[in-house]
């Protein structure tokens, strides 16, 4: 079972290349298309954790398990064309954040889609929290 490519993905272009061209392109040529930070990172090679994740990804693609979610802590893995269509759950320090990789994510890091901080929402200040609250009627 191969990945069914939705029509909107067929219109996608990354640096002038279609998704089909990217999937059939050798890794060396793909690396030349990436921005400098990602290009330099991939030229160094993959770390052991990244290599294990890539092997797992290739196994899932070979077996056609596109609906199964891949859980990982590897936030610094660059999204490659072969990852398009797969579901990932990336750890943000507290929980796993799930998302499906779409072509627009190619060249970004997995960690960019699993935000580690959330917006602080303060409640109402308590009694004596501010100087003006001394003059408010007592709650109760």
Curated annotation (Swiss-Prot):
Cited Gene3D superfamilies:
30s Ribosomal Protein S19, Chain A
What cellular component terms from Gene Ontology apply here?
cytosolic small ribosomal subunit
Biological process terms from the Gene Ontology for this record are: ribosomal small subunit assembly; translation
Keywords linked to the UniProt accession: Ribonucleoprotein, Ribosomal protein, RNA-binding, rRNA-binding
Coiled coil (UniProt feature):
none
Q: Out of the domains of life, which is the source?
A: Archaea
Output the Gene Ontology terms for molecular function: rRNA binding; structural constituent of ribosome
A Pfam family matched in the record = Ribosomal_S19
Describe the function of this protein: Protein S19 forms a complex with S13 that binds strongly to the 16S ribosomal RNA.
Alphabetical list of HAMAP family matching this protein:
Ribosomal_uS19 (MF_00531)
Which family, according to the similarity comment? Belongs to the universal ribosomal protein uS19 family.
Q: What is this protein called?
A: Small ribosomal subunit protein uS19
Q: What organism does the UniProt record list as the source? A: Sulfurisphaera tokodaii (strain DSM 16993 / JCM 10545 / NBRC 100140 / 7) (Sulfolobus tokodaii)
């Amino acid at each position: 079972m191969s990945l069914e490519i939705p029509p909107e993905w067929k219109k996608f272009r990354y640096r002038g290349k279609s998704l089909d061209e990217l999937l059939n392109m050798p890794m060396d040529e793909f690396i030349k298309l990436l921005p400098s930070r990602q290009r330099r990172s991939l030229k160094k090679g993959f770390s052991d954790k990244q290599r294990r994740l890539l092997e797992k990804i290739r196994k899932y693609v070979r077996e056609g398990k596109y609906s199964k979610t891949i859980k990982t802590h590897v936030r610094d893995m660059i999204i490659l064309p072969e990852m398009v269509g797969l579901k990932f759950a990336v750890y943000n320090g507290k929980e796993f954040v799930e998302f499906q990789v779409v072509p627009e994510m190619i060249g970004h890091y997995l960690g960019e889609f699993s935000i580690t901080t959330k917006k602080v929402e303060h409640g109402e200040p308590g009694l004596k929290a501010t100087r003006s609250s001394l003059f408010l009627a007592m709650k109760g």
